[in-house]
From Swiss-Prot:
<keyword id="KW-0964">Secreted</keyword>
<keyword id="KW-0479">Metal-binding</keyword>
<feature type="domain" description="EF-hand 5">
    <location>
        <begin position="197"/>
        <end position="232"/>
    </location>
</feature>
<dbReference type="InterPro" id="IPR018247">
    <property type="entry name" value="EF_Hand_1_Ca_BS"/>
</dbReference>
<protein>
    <recommendedName>
        <fullName>Secretagogin</fullName>
    </recommendedName>
</protein>
<feature type="binding site">
    <location>
        <position position="118"/>
    </location>
    <ligand>
        <name>Ca(2+) 3</name>
    </ligand>
</feature>
<feature type="binding site">
    <location>
        <position position="31"/>
    </location>
    <ligand>
        <name>Ca(2+) 1</name>
    </ligand>
</feature>
<feature type="binding site">
    <location>
        <position position="168"/>
    </location>
    <ligand>
        <name>Ca(2+) 4</name>
    </ligand>
</feature>
<keyword id="KW-0677">Repeat</keyword>
<feature type="binding site">
    <location>
        <position position="122"/>
    </location>
    <ligand>
        <name>Ca(2+) 3</name>
    </ligand>
</feature>
<dbReference type="Pfam" id="PF13499">
    <property type="entry name" value="EF-hand_7"/>
</dbReference>
<dbReference type="InterPro" id="IPR035798">
    <property type="entry name" value="EFh_SCGN"/>
</dbReference>
<feature type="binding site">
    <location>
        <position position="173"/>
    </location>
    <ligand>
        <name>Ca(2+) 4</name>
    </ligand>
</feature>
<dbReference type="InterPro" id="IPR011992">
    <property type="entry name" value="EF-hand-dom_pair"/>
</dbReference>
<feature type="binding site">
    <location>
        <position position="164"/>
    </location>
    <ligand>
        <name>Ca(2+) 4</name>
    </ligand>
</feature>
<feature type="domain" description="EF-hand 6">
    <location>
        <begin position="240"/>
        <end position="276"/>
    </location>
</feature>
<feature type="binding site">
    <location>
        <position position="25"/>
    </location>
    <ligand>
        <name>Ca(2+) 1</name>
    </ligand>
</feature>
């Protein structure tokens, strides 16, 4: 395995690998089928832009080692992580997989990150702001990299996650980078519930977003709630839209105008009467 890794084309980076991978894993499940492996390697060789026989032999060796090792599941699935580790450097692997190791399960935490790095409150993350995010990320994981490498990795991340190629990332792009888990509110069916069930669900919902446990939603807690609420009816919202919806919610629910949404205020907005 080590020899095969050393001989595979070093020019392949995370962005290039991701571009090829997406052809086969369009739903981003994180694996491809064993039956798709030949086509995957054909695209890999074509993307490398060379007809080097030695390289083709090495790719074939990687495939053989992959099939003879325990990297193929009983269902015939091959994980992206297994293939990427054979072709990408340690740092390039890190760019693809750091988010899989520490996925976010709470929109409040996600919005804290969004607000921190959208420093100019434009509703987008620029390349410079993404660079700051990656710098902090590498430091958090105790990885030392040069400024030149940081610029290169920022460029790579933009290639991978800037879906509409406008040179900036929106809310949905960052959610993909951070592997934000499924919308918490999807599990609740408020309209189809009895009054008691709605009250019980409300308690769960409020507790989920009241991360600080103060009895009021404020700052990123409001942001997280608004994001999840709006995405129930509009699957893809921008940072600008989120700010608009946030203002509307505060205008309607923040009765005492303290910039927070008290538990009783949110209940009133949702047409519920709760015990003090």
């Amino acid at each position: 395995m080590d020899n095969a890794r050393r001989k595979t084309p070093a020019r392949l980076d995370a962005a290039c690998f991701w571009q090829i991978w997406q052809r086969f894993d369009k739903e981003e499940k994180g694996y491809i089928r064993e039956t798709e492996l030949d086509a995957f390697f054909d695209h890999l060789l074509a993307k490398s832009g060379t007809e080097d026989t030695l390289m083709e032999e090495n790719v074939q060796k990687v495939k053989e080692q992959l099939m003879t090792s325990h990297n193929v599941s009983k269902e015939g699935r091959i994980l992206m992580k297994e293939l990427a580790s054979m072709f990408l450097s340690e740092d390039e692997n890190f760019l693809l997989f750091f988010r899989l190791e520490t996925p976010l399960d709470n929109s409040v935490e996600f919005m804290q990150i969004w607000r921190k790095y959208d420093a100019d409150s434009s509703g987008f993350i620029s390349a410079a702001e993404l660079c700051n995010f990656l710098r902090d990320l590498f430091l958090h994981h105790k990885k030392n990299i040069s400024e030149a490498e940081l610029e290169e990795y920022t460029s790579t991340m933009m290639k991978i996650f800037d879906k509409n190629k406008d040179g900036r990332l929106d809310l949905n792009d960052l959610a993909r980078i951070l592997a934000l888990q499924e919308n918490f509110l999807l599990q609740f069916k408020m309209d189809a519930s009895s009054t008691e069930e709605r009250k019980r669900d409300f308690e769960k919902i409020f507790a989920h977003y009241d991360v600080s446990k103060t009895g009021a939603l404020e700052g990123p807690e409001v942001d997280g709630f608004v994001k999840d609420m709006m995405e129930l009816v509009q699957p893809s919202i921008s940072g600008v839209d989120l700010d608009k919806f946030r203002e509307i919610l505060l205008r309607h629910c923040d009765v005492n105008k303290d910039g927070k949404i008290q538990k009783s205020e949110l209940a009133l907005c949702l047409g519920l009467k709760i015990n003090p």
